[in-house]
């Protein structure tokens, strides 16, 4: 596979033209066979296969022909079907073929994605959740509108195959993909409907489809954004001191008019910025309302004509940051005016100018979080803690660890907010819910539990806060907590409660448009 990748770099024309012969390479199925065994053994216990159940290359070749038959859809997608009728042996061979198909399609996709990232160096593309928060800090205060453009989750199988056809000239290599996608629908009456391109099972094939679909959407959008902005992004900021002027001069370009001795100085400042987390791209725009309407109209038309997909209007929402809040990602986001007093002393007199700067103000959604905790049976709808009855069968250490993990995730994720006082209300709810759960398990009272455990109750989270407050750069963290914030760098992913709250917000928007 590495050799094929090197050949694809040396000859870009050969790479997309001869993919179909790879389906008949025994090494390819050996790789997919080993990968399937590793995934199966890690996810669930698997019986030892006898010598007659080992991978047979002739059987795989026969199965390639059987994929095109309609009556083998249950065999291929046994893990997706709620009523599987195929045996394990057939599922084993079908999963091997799916792994082989994914390996073949991943080779050109890896080359395309790498070349596209190399071509977007001026766009400063970062692929990490930690790049979301610097984006919010840097771009949101200097934008007056945002577009919340959710990626369409459904697309017709033939449209997806044709997007592959634009990049792969080898048409026979796409026949297995077309057969797999059409068999995935499992019923002839759904021929006119669209399929969901979200992985219903944790297989490599469906994850690849999702990644390719998102990459296809973003590659077109990036090319359009680069046309609208021919220079890289500049970090905004006020420069009240002369020592900071060199930062500004570095981002100034000079060009001359024809037949003119005058030079024009232009500050490189694009007006459109893009970020994405999950399936929710966010486009920050600095401009008039007409520019925002044009961008929203372009996104709707782009999805309609490029993917032949009608996108509901509520899936592309525009917000004015100065008037109302936006929800992203798990925060209420707004932009507030922050007056900055600058004293400039000269020889003659003293000037005291006042600079008005914008600052992003992320707000912790306390009421929605309490509602989610009530849904998970940690408290009632009014925020009164209750016992988690489903956890009473666990050990005391497991109960303490689970409550501690929930609080640590919430505290770390929402530490970037200025006002974190509402988080301690959440901590109070979790603390009493944990005590009530332990009291219900041991058939005692909360007073007895708190007397027996003492500092052991939420000990880890308390020590984590003390460790954070005792850092050298935050010796006065208690006094500065209301005016400074630090984003924790150990956030591995979007908080699950933030995802749940975001889904509730999406349902509210959909119901509003349905009315």
Curated annotation (Swiss-Prot):
The keyword tRNA processing applies. Its main location: plastid. It is found in: Plastid, Chloroplast. GO terms for cellular component: chloroplast. InterPro entries: Domain_X, Maturase_MatK, Maturase_MatK_N. Keywords: Chloroplast, mRNA processing, Plastid, RNA-binding, tRNA processing. The keyword Chloroplast applies. Usually encoded in the trnK tRNA gene intron. Probably assists in splicing its own and other chloroplast group II introns. Belongs to the intron maturase 2 family. MatK subfamily. This is Maturase K. It comes from Pinus yunnanensis.
């Amino acid at each position: 596979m590495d050799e094929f990748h090197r050949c694809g770099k040396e000859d870009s024309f050969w790479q997309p033209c001869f993919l179909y012969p790879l389906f008949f390479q025994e090494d390819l199925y050996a790789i997919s066979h080993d990968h399937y065994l590793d995934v199966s053994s890690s996810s669930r216990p698997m019986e030892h296969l006898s010598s007659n159940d080992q991978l047979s290359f002739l059987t795989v070749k026969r199965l390639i022909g059987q994929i095109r038959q309609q009556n083998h859809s249950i065999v291929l997608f046994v893990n997706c079907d709620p009523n599987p009728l195929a045996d394990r042996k057939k599922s084993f061979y079908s999963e091997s073929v799916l792994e082989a198909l994914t390996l073949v399609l991943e080779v050109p996709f890896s080359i395309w994605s790498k070349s596209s990232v190399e071509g977007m160096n001026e766009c400063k593309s970062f692929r990490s959740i930690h790049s979301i928060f610097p984006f919010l800090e840097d771009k949101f205060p200097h934008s007056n509108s945002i577009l919340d453009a959710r990626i369409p989750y459904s697309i017709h199988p033939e449209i997806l195959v044709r997007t592959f056809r634009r990049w792969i000239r080898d048409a026979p290599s796409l026949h297995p993909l077309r057969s797999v996608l059409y068999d995935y629908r499992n019923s002839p009456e759904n021929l006119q409907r669209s399929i969901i391109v979200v992985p219903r099972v944790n297989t490599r094939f469906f994850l690849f489809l999702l990644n390719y679909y998102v990459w296809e959407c973003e590659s077109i959008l990036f090319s359009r954004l680069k046309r609208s902005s021919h220079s890289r992004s500049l970090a905004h900021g006020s420069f009240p001191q002369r020592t900071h002027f060199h930062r500004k001069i570095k981002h100034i370009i000079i060009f001359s008019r024809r037949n003119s001795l005058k030079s024009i100085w232009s500050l490189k400042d694009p007006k459109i910025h893009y970020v994405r987390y999950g399936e929710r791209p966010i486009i920050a725009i600095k401009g008039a309302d007409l520019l925002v309407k044009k961008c929203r109209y372009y996104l709707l038309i782009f999805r309609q004509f490029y993917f032949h997909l009608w996108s509901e209007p509520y899936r592309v929402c525009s917000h004015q940051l100065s008037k109302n809040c936006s929800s992203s990602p798990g925060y209420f986001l707004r932009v507030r005016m922050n007056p900055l007093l600058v004293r400039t002393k000269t020889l003659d007199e003293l000037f005291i100018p006042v600079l008005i700067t914008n600052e992003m103000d992320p707000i912790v959604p306390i009421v929605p979080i309490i509602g989610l905790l009530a849904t998970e049976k940690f408290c009632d709808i009014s925020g009164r803690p209750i016992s988690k009855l489903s956890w009473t069968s666990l050990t005391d250490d497991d109960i303490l660890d689970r409550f501690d993990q929930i609080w640590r995730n919430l505290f770390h994720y929402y530490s970037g907010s200025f006002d974190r006082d509402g988080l301690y209300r959440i901590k109070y709810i979790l603390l009493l819910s944990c005590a009530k759960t332990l009291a219900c398990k041991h058939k005692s009272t909360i007073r007895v539990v708190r007397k027996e455990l003492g500092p052991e109750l939420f000990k880890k989270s308390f020590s984590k806060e003390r460790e954070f407050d005792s850092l050298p750069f935050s010796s006065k963290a208690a006094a500065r907590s209301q005016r400074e914030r630090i984003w924790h760098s150990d956030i591995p992913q979007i908080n699950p409660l933030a995802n749940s709250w975001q889904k509730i917000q999406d349902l509210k928007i959909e119901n509003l448009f349905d009315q």
